[in-house]
Amino acid sequence: MNFAWDQPAPERKGRPNAFGLTPEDLESLGCPGRSQHVFSQLQRQWQWIEEHPFLSKEVRYWLEDHTDLSLPILSQALHSEDGSTKCILSLNDGELIEVVHMPREVKTSRVTLCISSQVGCAMGCTFCATGAMGIKRNLESGEIVGQVLLLMKTLGPKTPDHLTLVFMGMGEPLHNLMNVHKAIQILSHSHGLNISPKRITVSTSGLVSGIERLARMTPRPLLAISLNATTDEVRSSSMPINRAYNLSQLRHALDSWILKTNEKLTFEYVLMRGVNDSYLDAHRLSEWLGELRHQHNVNLIPMNEHRASDQKEPSRESLEIFSRTLRDLGCFVTVRKSRGRDIQAACGQLIRNL
């Protein structure tokens, strides 16, 4: 059986985006000057690139001739009552992606950015609006880094020390692993924004081959698994990827991840009314987790309804029973408070050009 994610998503051709280049890339391309210095100024002082006070004219002219110095364009910003902002960004080829800027609810300058890895998504999850788009193309590393730079410039925070990144926007990050990982290399580089990989989370629908590859890479972000079902039958009906990598194969890959990395996982579980929110589902979830339930977080996410799916959010009673049952069984449980639901910016609601 062939699946959309068996083939690489389309890539773009042309001059490399300057913000997606490492110091080694700059050196290999023949950039004049010290490549580490040029990289540092690109990442930290990008808003001044046209009249950059810390780069020579020779370097600026070389960058203009040999690279693409553009960032995504902020086409529209929708502001939620809860303080979050959905940003619709336009890319060089006219494609649109969405990013969500979420300040912490307490009085602090800390911000979480929910960023995208692809235009569309090949996974086809029935509860996710992005899946209804299909896959258009991968984002380049510079377009991923560009989301962060642009949002820092327009909405903050002013310092990357106050920033947390989650690859939970449009796309399956592990279907675009090379560009996603290169972006993480750049964002965490000590001469760049220097964002710790421990403040970067990659969420996957369960692309086992990508999980295995990511476990061998450095720097390595935190990993979240979009689980959402306790039987192969239900998971395959709502998440087609389960037909390629079933729950048993996924669990084996996660055991290997933990053995290799010794890092905690987050299990995301979107609760859908009448689909996966029963008392029996809670017991099966605890059983599937086994010993993992004591140390690894189960993050319950009430379904965020949207026009691309018929799935409904659970009742408050079923959510409370489900979470209480898991806790009684020894699971470490959190319930996500969805941000930006009033502007269609919550988990599973990001979509363009449907």
Mark where each language-model region is.
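Canonical Radical SAM [4Fe-4S] cluster-binding loop centered on the CxxxCxxC motif
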Residues: 105-143, 149-150
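Conserved AdoMet/S-adenosylmethionine-binding subsite of the radical SAM
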Residues: 152-325, 329-331
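Alpha-helix N-cap/helix-start and coil->helix boundary motif
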Residues: 122, 207-209, 232, 340-344
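A short, surface-exposed beta-strand/turn
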Residues: 98-106
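Auxiliary Fe-S-binding modules of radical SAM enzymes
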Residues: 1-94, 103, 255-263, 271-354
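Generic beta-strand structural signal
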Residues: 85, 97, 111-115, 123, ...
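Short linear Ser/Thr-Pro motifs
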Residues: 79-80, 116-117, 203, 226
